[in-house]
């Protein structure tokens, strides 16, 4: 979609920034970003819901929990847990708080790819948004959580946006009915 937009508007420059939903929302509130593709956060911005995304358990191949149809949330209290973005307001932390779960954290990292590598190596289990998991689907087992946990994923943007941002917003909203379910790679 970015290349299609720039074909129509070659004079508009774009900068793509990666970060957690909370980091990107903070950039939006500080006017350091015009748009954020994030899980839902409160704040002084507009919001367009794109999808309700399931959270999934990440398991190493051959792990006993891979025999189940879903991973019970309380399994994270006893299994070796790999925490991504420790101490930050991320979806995993929100899910554990919502479920009153204290995970058995044995490893932590500030890099989601390191989380997947550690899971693949059998060091523990983790959770992530399903939309982020497609790049690893052949190397890590993804199972639903029990009870089911989801996060709203959408486009956040400022209340007062520039004409260039307005053009991008119209372009995106015109495309929304045609957006495939797996389009975005969201860190969180």
PLM features: residue spans?
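A late-sequence structural motif
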Residues: 141-185
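Secondary-structure junction motif
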Residues: 79-100, 165-167, 179-185
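Residues embedded in well-ordered beta-strands
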Residues: 36, 56-58, 64, 82, ...
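Flexible hinge/capping segments at coil-to-helix
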Residues: 45-55, 59-81, 166
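Short beta-strand->loop
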Residues: 46-56, 126, 130-131, 138-152
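Hydrophobic hinge/microswitch elements
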Residues: 20-24, 29, 87-140
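Central regulatory/effector-binding core of bacterial HTH transcription factors
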Residues: 1-43, 109
């Amino acid at each position: 979609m970015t290349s299609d937009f720039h074909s129509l508007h070659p004079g508009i420059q774009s900068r793509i920034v990666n970060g957690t939903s909370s980091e990107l929302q903070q950039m939006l509130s500080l006017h350091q970003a015009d748009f954020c593709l994030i899980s839902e956060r409160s704040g002084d911005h507009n919001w367009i819901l794109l999808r309700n995304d399931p959270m999934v358990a990440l398991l190493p191949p051959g792990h006993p929990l891979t025999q189940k149809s879903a991973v019970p949330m309380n399994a994270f209290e006893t299994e070796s847990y790999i925490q991504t973005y420790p101490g930050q307001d991320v979806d995993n932390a929100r899910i554990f708080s919502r479920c009153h779960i204290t995970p058995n954290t044995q490893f932590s990292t500030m890099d989601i790819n390191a989380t997947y590598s550690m899971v693949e190596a059998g060091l523990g289990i983790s959770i992530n948004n399903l939309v982020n998991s497609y790049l690893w689907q052949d190397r890590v087992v993804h199972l639903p959580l029990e009870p089911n946990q989801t996060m709203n994923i959408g486009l956040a943007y400022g209340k007062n946006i520039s004409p260039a941002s307005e053009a991008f917003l119209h372009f995106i909203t015109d495309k929304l009915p045609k957006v495939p379910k797996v389009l975005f790679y969201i860190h969180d």
